[in-house]
C-alpha cells in the first residue's frame, strides 16, 4: 500500500533562482515558472551575499516558482534557509500565464525590523560577483547533510 506524496511549490527570489544552486541541494532541476510576489521588497543584507524579503505595500519581488517539491526536498530547503527565514504561504502571480494567481510557499526574513536590511538585492550582480563562492558553500552544505551528489 503506497502513501500519498505531497508536492509543494516554492517561490524563490534569491540564490535559489540559480539552477546550479538548486541542483546541488535537490540533485535535480524542478519545473519552474516566472512569478511576481506582490507587496514584498527584496533587500540586500549587510555582510551577506543573499537577499531577504519582507512585506512592503505597493512593492513587488520578481522570482520563480519551483514546482513538484517533495516533503524531503522542502526539508532540505528549510535547512538551507535556516532560522533567519520563516516559511510562509503566499500568493504569487505567474507572469508567463497572464498573471494567474498561485498559492505557494516562500521564505520571509524573520526579523522584520532588521537594521541590516538595505537597498534592493540584484540577482544579475550576485551571479557575477558571488555565485562561484556561493556554489562552493552550497556544495559543502549539501555534503554536511549527506545529500546525494550532484554533477556540477
Curated annotation (Swiss-Prot):
Species whose genome carries this gene: Arabidopsis thaliana
Signal peptide as annotated in the record: none
EC identifiers of the protein: 2.3.2.-
Family: Belongs to the gamma-glutamylcyclotransferase family.
Tissue/organ expression: Expressed mainly in leaves.
UniProt name for this protein: AIG2-like protein D
Key word Transferase present: yes
Gene induction: Down-regulated by biological and chemical stimuli.
First-level EC class: transferase
Pfam family, one: GGACT
Lineage: Eukaryota, Viridiplantae, Streptophyta, Embryophyta, Tracheophyta
